[in-house]
């Protein structure tokens, strides 16, 4: 059968996001940040060093891409593929948000901007975009499935914070 591939990468470190249009699978495992955009690595090194020196921490966004996934996985109700992916991602400790495709950013788009137009090229169906993240109506569309999740900054930091104990 057709082979599929799943790959993940860190696409944002604190306030510094990378250009996911510059995604390069080969770069991901060749840097300590698992960043797919080579141009961000030095910036992230400096940024994280400053965060660490200040005694603080930062969050991150991890994007997962699945290629070669057959059309038709999932269901329109109850067993939606995007629901299952979001549930699995939310079960990871420290995850505070999940996006499928354009996710939260789709709220800023018009219907025309967000819709993934389909056209025929030869005998194959193609899409002009992938805002839906490869899932339409809970069912895989045959496009690359793209999902991301946000991880909160660790609360184990060196800076003084107000808290309470059993005495108040």
Regions found by a protein language model. Name each.
Residues 42, 167-168:
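Catalytic/RNA-binding core of pseudouridine synthases
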């Amino acid at each position: 059968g057709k082979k599929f591939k799943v790959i993940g990468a860190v696409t944002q470190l604190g306030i510094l996001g990378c250009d996911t249009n510059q995604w390069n699978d080969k770069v991901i495992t060749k840097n300590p940040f698992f960043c797919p955009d080579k141009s961000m690595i030095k910036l992230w090194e400096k940024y994280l060093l400053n965060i660490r020196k200040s005694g603080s921490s930062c969050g991150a966004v991890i994007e997962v891409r699945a290629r070669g996934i057959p059309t038709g996985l999932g269901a329109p109700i109850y067993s939606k593929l995007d629901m299952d992916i979001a549930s699995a991602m939310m079960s990871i400790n420290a995850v505070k948000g999940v996006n499928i495709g354009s996710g939260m950013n789709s709220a800023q788009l018009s219907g025309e901007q967000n819709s993934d137009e389909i056209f025929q090229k030869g005998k194959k169906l193609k899409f002009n975009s992938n805002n839906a993240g490869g899932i339409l109506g809970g069912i895989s569309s045959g496009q690359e499935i793209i999902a991301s999740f946000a991880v909160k900054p660790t609360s184990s930091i060196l800076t003084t914070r107000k808290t309470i104990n059993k005495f108040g």
